[in-house]
Amino acid sequence: MKTFVLHIFIFAFVAFASASRDSAKKIGSQYDNYETCLTEHGLTDDDIFSIGEVSSGQHKTNHEDTELHKNGCVMQCMLEKDGLMSGADYDEEKMREDYIKETGAQPGDQRIEALNTCMQETKDMEDKCDKSLILVACVLAAEAVLADSSEGA
């Protein structure tokens, strides 16, 4: 019985450490063009918000508008280099395809619906940088809510 409890404790600790590590990662840092886009915008990794900060919405209250805009410009740069965006316009179909490929989401998955909702909510925004950050924040927040609801189920 002690061994079983120890295994559960170790599993819970590893799961928590993994989730904490992901939330500490910088938004977009897993993508190929991250460093290029940082350089193009004169930013460093320290200037970019963490996934946890964005998914919880803390980035909106903890940072100045210029920091929000700069982070958005890096997101837009990566989306554009990946062919998902041109200026302030999304390629919605390609964005869905890439999202499905990246997440392994299946038809009917709530994450795809969340992406569609986030694209719809931001599609008329004119500033490409603000639009990109708000889209990324919307998707990350939706994923966090969906993950929390599936853990409680």
Swiss-Prot record:
Pfam families: PBP_GOBP. The keyword Signal applies. GO terms for molecular function: pheromone binding. Residues 1-19 form the signal peptide. The keyword Signal applies. It comes from the Eukaryota. Belongs to the PBP/GOBP family. It is found in: Secreted. Keywords: Behavior, Disulfide bond, Pheromone response, Pheromone-binding, Secreted, Signal, Transport. Its main location: secreted. GO terms for cellular component: extracellular space. GO terms for biological process: response to pheromone; social behavior. Homodimer. This is Pheromone-binding protein Gp-9. Colony queen number, a major feature of social organization, is associated with worker genotype for Gp-9. Colonies are headed by either a single reproductive queen (monogyne form) or multiple queens (polygyne form). Differences in worker Gp-9 genotypes between social forms may cause differences in workers' abilities to recognize queens and regulate their numbers. Gene3D superfamilies: Pheromone/general odorant binding protein domain. Disulfide bonds join 37-77, 73-129, 118-138.
